[in-house]
Amino acid sequence: QRQMCIRDRPYFIDSTNFYDGYWQTSKYFKPFREELLEIFSPSDIILKKVFDWRKSIDSSNTVAVHIRRGDYLNNINRNSLKGGNVIGDVDYYLSAIKIIKEKVKNPLFCFFSDDITWCKDTFSNKLDNSLFVENTGSDAALVDLFSISFCEHGIMSPSTFSWWGNWLRKDKNGSIVVAPKGEYSNEYFLEKSWLII
């Protein structure tokens, strides 16, 4: 793959080749979605941790809000996001939340982030129907990834982690996913059903 988030022409594949690239478009593997969902199923340990936080809530309208900050906070990574930057852009997230509220009855906004303290400080006084999920331990990223996929709806940050969490959602019927406009919002990276704002 020559350019990130853009699908190249298909090449002949044989077992002696090694392929290197970002592969950040489902156009490469959409025909194998069911197979991939089976391959990328969480282990029993991860699944238990996902359900541990979910069983404490009484909502079938969970919305995963993924906010990536971490490495995007330094100027080099922040400036590499061409055509838009939503890192820490509270307005983007509030707009996405407003859209979800208009379309989903009684949504519960479940925040996942590598900076959950910032999320609490920023959003806890703006929403009364929110949950800040703090997974810890060496498997926290996997628990977050599958937790995002088990939520009924999603609000993405511009990251492949966010993309995979939403793409791995098994039941997509009626699922609403909001994604930010920018470098990643091209016809290859985002699914056609996702809302771009």
Regions found by a protein language model. Name each.
Residues 2, 129-131, 194:
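Short, conserved active-site loop motifs that form the nucleotide-linked donor/cofactor pocket
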Residues 3, 7-104:
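Secretory-pathway luminal glycosyltransferase catalytic domains
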Residues 183-197:
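Leloir-type glycosyltransferase catalytic cores
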